[in-house]
């Protein structure tokens, strides 16, 4: 959520920045709403003051033994007008808030202007794609040969875009998540957290999934039903519950940064993805991910983005998987992001790089929604924190990359060296 003061006082500048990411801000409507809000605010305050003044006269008149009925009627009439003005002001403020919640974050000035993924900027590459002297198989074929990926069973149990993993493939999937968690907690300084997979609407508003992206979630009740304590949604990413741990909190600045990680399943309806990546593990309704979250002082967040992205890169480097680092353009960034790097891993069967991690600085966009603040030790003043998040990594897509990059001519999969301690010393599976 953007700063309301910016929307009031720097509207043209805000509109220009939003236009860079392809969002057209209705400047005229916002101006009209703000003018109407000011009028109603003045009217409400004036009626309140007048009613208070006339109420005091009733007591004085009563003490003098005068007839107070005319004054009482006048006060009642003022009260009715005040209630009506307050109701209109509340309605308008809710409309203004609803509009504000639908406006995306402002892109940082360092973000390249562009329309879509074709305008993203390649920052760097790591590793060289392996050359094969045999016909490369994709991860689906490799997994089925090993008896470890069963999509037919998942269709029977649930439907499309789910999978049943078995045997050494399931073990490797678990090993990858464990390896990532150990790396982030033991080497990168993150606190491991275990969080609910179902969250309430306030949590989803806090990180920006609601109200705009309700259709992308799996809900326990229809979204249009009034939210209550039992109206939950499955998390689309651990970013949602982990970041919301600081909602409505005031943190001491010396305690920052907070660095937290969690391994969770993630659930997405993939609305709008019909026909895309229908084969295999790339685009699933349920998938595992190890998420990293940082809560920082405002002045530290850009350096934290570089650090957090480096932590995701380290996973790929230790697994010896070739990848490239992309700086997303304004038109390809997520709704709440101010700046985002994507890491794309090399998939031999597709002969291309595919996203495996997205690392973003959300600036104070989520913090304002969550009212997450930090307090200075010296002057005791509070200000909004900055929030960052990144995949470290998507476990299923990492499994895809390992299967394809480590495949052998006979269909076996070499186990990456860093995973062998998690797999009982196995060197090959399949």
UniProtKB/Swiss-Prot annotation:
Gene3D superfamilies the UniProt entry points to: Bira Bifunctional Protein, Domain 2, Serine-tRNA synthetase, tRNA binding domain
Domain of life assignment: Bacteria
Keyword set includes Ligase: yes
Residues binding ATP, per UniProt: 268-270, 355-358
Matches recorded under Pfam families: Seryl_tRNA_N, tRNA-synt_2b
Annotated Gene Ontology cellular component terms: cytoplasm
Keyword ATP-binding: yes
PROSITE patterns xref list: AA_TRNA_LIGASE_II
Amino acids binding L-serine: 237-239, 291, 391
Recorded catalytic activity of this chain's protein: tRNA(Ser) + L-serine + ATP = L-seryl-tRNA(Ser) + AMP + diphosphate + H(+); tRNA(Sec) + L-serine + ATP = L-seryl-tRNA(Sec) + AMP + diphosphate + H(+)
Broad class of enzyme this protein falls into: ligase
UniProt-listed Enzyme Commission number(s): 6.1.1.11
Principal place of residence: cytoplasm
Annotated pathway: Aminoacyl-tRNA biosynthesis; selenocysteinyl-tRNA(Sec) biosynthesis; L-seryl-tRNA(Sec) from L-serine and tRNA(Sec): step 1/1
CDD domains: SerRS_core
GO molecular function annotations of the record: ATP binding; serine-tRNA ligase activity
Domain observations: Consists of two distinct domains, a catalytic core and a N-terminal extension that is involved in tRNA binding.
HAMAP family named among the record's database cross-references: Ser_tRNA_synth_type1
NCBIfam families: serS
Function: Catalyzes the attachment of serine to tRNA(Ser). Is also able to aminoacylate tRNA(Sec) with serine, to form the misacylated tRNA L-seryl-tRNA(Sec), which will be further converted into selenocysteinyl-tRNA(Sec).
Family: Belongs to the class-II aminoacyl-tRNA synthetase family. Type-1 seryl-tRNA synthetase subfamily.
Protein name: Serine--tRNA ligase
Native source species: Yersinia enterocolitica serotype O:8 / biotype 1B (strain NCTC 13174 / 8081)
């Amino acid at each position: 959520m953007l700063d309301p003061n910016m929307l009031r006082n720097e509207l043209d500048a805000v509109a220009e920045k939003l236009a860079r990411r392809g969002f057209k801000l209705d400047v005229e409507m916002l101006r009209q709403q703000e003018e109407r809000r000011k009028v109603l605010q003045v009217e409400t305050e004036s009626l309140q003051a007048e009613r208070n003044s006339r109420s005091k006269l009733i007591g004085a008149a009563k003490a003098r033994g005068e007839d107070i009925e005319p004054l009482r009627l006048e006060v009642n009439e003022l009260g009715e007008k005040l209630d009506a003005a307050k109701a209109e002001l509340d309605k308008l403020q809710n409309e203004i808030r609803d509009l504000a919640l639908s406006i995306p974050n402002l892109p940082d000035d360092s973000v390249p202007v562009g329309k879509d993924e074709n305008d993203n900027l390649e920052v760097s590459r790591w590793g060289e794609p392996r050359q094969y002297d045999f016909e490369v198989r994709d991860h689906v074929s490799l997994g089925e040969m090993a008896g470890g990926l069963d999509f037919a069973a998942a269709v029977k149990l649930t439907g499309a875009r789910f999978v049943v993993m078995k045997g050494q493939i399931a073990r490797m999937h678990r090993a990858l998540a464990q390896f990532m968690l150990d790396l982030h907690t033991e080497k990168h300084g993150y606190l491991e957290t275990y969080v609910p997979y179902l969250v309430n609407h306030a949590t989803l508003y806090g990180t920006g999934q609601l109200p705009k992206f309700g259709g992308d979630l799996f809900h326990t009740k229809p979204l249009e039903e009034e939210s209550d304590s039992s109206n939950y949604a499955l998390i689309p990413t651990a970013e949602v519950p982990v970041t919301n741990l600081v909602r409505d909190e005031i943190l001491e600045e010396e305690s920052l940064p907070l660095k937290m990680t969690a391994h969770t399943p993630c659930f997405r309806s993939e609305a709008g993805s019909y026909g895309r990546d229908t084969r295999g593990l790339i685009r699933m309704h349920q998938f595992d991910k190890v998420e990293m979250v940082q809560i920082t002082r405002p002045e530290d967040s850009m350096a934290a983005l570089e650090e957090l992205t480096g932590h995701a890169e380290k996973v790929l480097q230790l697994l010896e998987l070739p990848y490239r680092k992309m700086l997303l353009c304004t038109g390809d960034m997520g709704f709440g992001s101010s700046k985002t790097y994507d890491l794309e891993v090399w998939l031999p069967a597709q002969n291309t790089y595919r996203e495996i991690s997205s690392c973003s600085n959300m600036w104070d966009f989520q913090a304002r929604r969550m009212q997450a603040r930090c307090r200075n030790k010296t002057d005791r003043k509070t200000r909004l924190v900055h929030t960052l998040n990144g995949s470290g990594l998507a476990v299923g897509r990492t499994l895809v990359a390992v299967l394809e990059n480590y495949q052998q001519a006979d269909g076996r999969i070499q186990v990456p060296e860093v995973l062998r301690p998690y797999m009982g010393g196995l060197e090959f599976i399949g």
